[in-house]
Amino acid sequence: MAPSLEEIRKAQRADGPAGILGIGTANPPNHVLQAEYPDYYFRITNSDHMTDLKEKFKRMCDKSMIRKRHMHLTEEFLKENPKMCAYMAPSLDTRQDIVVVEVPKLGKEAAVKAIKEWGQPKSKITHVVFCTTSGVDMPGADYQLTKLLGLRPSVKRLMMYQQGCFAGGTVLRLAKDLAENNRGARVLVVCSEITAVTFRGPSDTHLDSLVGQALFSDGAAALIVGSDPDTSVGEKPIFEMVSAAQTILPDSDGAIDGHLREVGLTFHLLKDVPGLISKNIEKSLDEAFKPLGISDWNSLFWIAHPGGPAILDQVEIKLGLKAEKMRATRHVLSEYGNMSSACVLFILDEMRKKSAKDGAATTGEGLEWGVLFGFGPGLTVETVVLHSVPL
């Protein structure tokens, strides 16, 4: 007798929660020190005459809590392509030519590391989720990555463009659903971000653009996600994903916008972004943790997208968080800057490494439950509930 639809459906689904089975990160070799960046930025964009603006930018960089950032764009390249250094010069072709090649390439570097840690043959990868804010092309970076890694042609791909800074949470939410609804699925998740599409010179009429120039940087991170790890071949979760939610914050229209134009990708930020996030964050926490009976936010380990120091400061104050709660987040902001969607995956990596180094009892700084937040255009907030594993 043929199996019933219910039996088929049950057989298709995994038994346990999705877990992160490997993490890898990569950055371009070229990096800039934040203390030196204002002088470099105003020189390379031929803007040294804008002395007041340069002072403002210096203050932004000083307050950013960033020590260094990695960037694919070098001084030599920018000198050869002056249109990218102007505030509003048509330059999309030049920018596109960079990102359609470099985004998948940097993604591959991170993916190779994640696959190595996972320790299984890449032929076991069933799904690819690729996320980037830049470089729309057909076929996309998901296809390029599949070719670069030599994955099976039958791998099931999903390409996410133009999401912005919350998307590190989005890819985890999607990977969780893919892994838990497809028995044996192993999902390669890649976030690869290159600022070549947003870099531009200063404008005294658009100070919000300068905020992005002070914060944004390049990086890629990759994860392998799967349910029911096969311990006989050495699969072991680093973190498990328990639930995932997305919401649009009230009264936040236009708080963060990005527009792809002939001049590249322009970013527009309202000052009140930290206020909007801190005002609404407790509602997201309540909805995520009430089912678990958790209401002490200091009992969680924290992985928050470091949009900028003001967001972290205001969230800490609003929730009464102890200073050490944002340690991993602030460390990644300091050493890498705001790498958009890749940031939270870098923070996951930093947290489990530091937890092991410090001899903590779990991958989550010795704690059992944690939260991962993504914030970005919308304002959109992604909330992922994480469960650590014993070390």
Curated annotation (Swiss-Prot):
<dbReference type="GO" id="GO:0030639">
    <property type="term" value="P:polyketide biosynthetic process"/>
</dbReference>
<dbReference type="GO" id="GO:0009813">
    <property type="term" value="P:flavonoid biosynthetic process"/>
</dbReference>
<dbReference type="InterPro" id="IPR012328">
    <property type="entry name" value="Chalcone/stilbene_synt_C"/>
</dbReference>
<dbReference type="InterPro" id="IPR001099">
    <property type="entry name" value="Chalcone/stilbene_synt_N"/>
</dbReference>
<keyword id="KW-0284">Flavonoid biosynthesis</keyword>
<dbReference type="Pfam" id="PF02797">
    <property type="entry name" value="Chal_sti_synt_C"/>
</dbReference>
<keyword id="KW-0808">Transferase</keyword>
<comment type="function">
    <text>The primary product of this enzyme is 4,2',4',6'-tetrahydroxychalcone (also termed naringenin-chalcone or chalcone) which can under specific conditions spontaneously isomerize into naringenin.</text>
</comment>
<feature type="active site">
    <location>
        <position position="165"/>
    </location>
</feature>
<protein>
    <recommendedName>
        <fullName>Chalcone synthase</fullName>
        <ecNumber>2.3.1.74</ecNumber>
    </recommendedName>
</protein>
<comment type="similarity">
    <text>Belongs to the thiolase-like superfamily. Chalcone/stilbene synthases family.</text>
</comment>
<dbReference type="GO" id="GO:0016210">
    <property type="term" value="F:naringenin-chalcone synthase activity"/>
</dbReference>
<dbReference type="InterPro" id="IPR011141">
    <property type="entry name" value="Polyketide_synthase_type-III"/>
</dbReference>
<dbReference type="InterPro" id="IPR018088">
    <property type="entry name" value="Chalcone/stilbene_synthase_AS"/>
</dbReference>
<comment type="pathway">
    <text>Secondary metabolite biosynthesis; flavonoid biosynthesis.</text>
</comment>
<keyword id="KW-0012">Acyltransferase</keyword>
<dbReference type="Pfam" id="PF00195">
    <property type="entry name" value="Chal_sti_synt_N"/>
</dbReference>
<dbReference type="InterPro" id="IPR016039">
    <property type="entry name" value="Thiolase-like"/>
</dbReference>
